């Protein structure tokens, strides 16, 4: 008698199939690595897909220079332990402008350092397929995105011009200059991600676990004081309001644009229990998602992840 796969094993098998399919179909794929929990799961699945061999493609981190310090330390640790072929790209135009989320705002900062930075890297290395860790349950525009998300020669996404995906059949044919973004975790939920991390004991950035951290409330968002740069952009009143609180992060990005949540969950089982009870989206803490109605879809149309 054949044992039935659990839903996590079914999701795992589906994701591994997608990763292998892309590696077979495309000439120069790359895996985007944002250092977050979804990237950790996607990287784990990719290593499983080609074990005992090495990944047949590099991993790409589009750096904004404003990630949490713990994320940078974790990235270097993973590269060292796993022997990853890591490419790091920072938009030189953004560096020249001293781009930051305080002076230029979240929308401009994200466009220059993330969207344009990603497009530069994809063009520079000639990648024709890029794996991303987005899931359909995260946000409305992502809910309607295909597993194979086709982009034109300028990396733009047209939601009205996407191919049908029947069962596990994917059409990877692209014209010269076109590319695709591939989302192997499309059908996973946030709870699935955490349960799989627990099941597989996947290492993740410690920021996901609750700890006493210095925070300041900015426009209703609890922002962690990660380094001294932020202090020069705070008013005297805001500096005076800095305090310590038990918080953790459900999602990670540029630290001034990522809100912490009050929590006492210090272990994976406690995080899973918290996920079973929560009724809010993990991306409620992402400032860039609140720029304007439909802002995420517009970002994706311009070439965002």
Curated annotation (Swiss-Prot):
Signal peptide: none annotated. Keywords: ATP-binding, Nucleotide-binding, Nucleotidyltransferase, Transferase. One of its GO terms (molecular function) is sulfate adenylyltransferase (ATP) activity. CDD domains: Sulfate_adenylyltransferase_2. GO terms for biological process: hydrogen sulfide biosynthetic process; sulfate assimilation. It catalyses: sulfate + ATP + H(+) = adenosine 5'-phosphosulfate + diphosphate. Pathway: Sulfur metabolism; hydrogen sulfide biosynthesis; sulfite from sulfate: step 1/3. Its EC number is 2.7.7.4. Heterodimer composed of CysD, the smaller subunit, and CysN. With CysN forms the ATP sulfurylase (ATPS) that catalyzes the adenylation of sulfate producing adenosine 5'-phosphosulfate (APS) and diphosphate, the first enzymatic step in sulfur assimilation pathway. APS synthesis involves the formation of a high-energy phosphoric-sulfuric acid anhydride bond driven by GTP hydrolysis by CysN coupled to ATP hydrolysis by CysD. This is Sulfate adenylyltransferase subunit 2. It comes from Stutzerimonas stutzeri (strain A1501) (Pseudomonas stutzeri). The lineage of its organism: Bacteria, Pseudomonadati, Pseudomonadota, Gammaproteobacteria, Pseudomonadales.
């Amino acid at each position: 008698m054949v044992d039935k796969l659990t839903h996590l094993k079914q999701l795992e098998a589906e994701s591994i199939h997608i990763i292998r399919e892309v590696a077979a179909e495309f000439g120069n794929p790359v895996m985007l690595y944002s250092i977050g929990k979804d990237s950790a799961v996607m990287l784990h699945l990719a290593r499983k897909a080609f074990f005992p061999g090495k990944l047949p493609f590099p991993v790409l981190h589009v750096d904004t220079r404003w990630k949490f310090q713990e994320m940078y330390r974790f990235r270097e640790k993973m590269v060292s332990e796993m022997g990853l072929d890591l490419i790091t790209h920072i938009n030189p135009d953004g560096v020249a402008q001293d781009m930051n989320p305080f002076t230029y705002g979240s929308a401009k900062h994200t466009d220059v350092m993330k969207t344009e930075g990603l497009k530069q890297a994809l063009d520079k290395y000639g990648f024709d397929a890029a794996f991303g860790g987005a899931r359909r349950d995260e946000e409305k525009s992502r809910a309607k995105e295909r597993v194979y998300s086709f982009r034109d020669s300028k990396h733009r996404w047209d939601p009205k011009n996407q191919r049908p995906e029947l069962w596990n059949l994917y059409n990877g044919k692209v014209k010269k200059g076109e590319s695709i973004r591939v989302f192997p975790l499309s059908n996973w939920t946030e709870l699935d991600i955490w349960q799989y991390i627990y099941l597989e004991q996947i290492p993740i950035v410690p920021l996901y676990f609750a700890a006493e951290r210095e925070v300041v409330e900015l426009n209703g968002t609890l922002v962690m004081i990660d380094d001294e740069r932020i202090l020069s952009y705070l008013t005297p009143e805001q500096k005076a309001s800095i305090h310590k609180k038990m918080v953790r992060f459900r999602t990670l990005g540029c630290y001034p644009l990522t809100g912490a949540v009050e929590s006492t969950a210090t272990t994976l089982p406690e995080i899973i229990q918290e996920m079973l009870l929560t009724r809010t989206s993990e991306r409620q803490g992402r400032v860039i998602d609140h720029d304007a109605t439909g802002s995420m879809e517009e970002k994706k149309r311009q070439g965002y992840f």
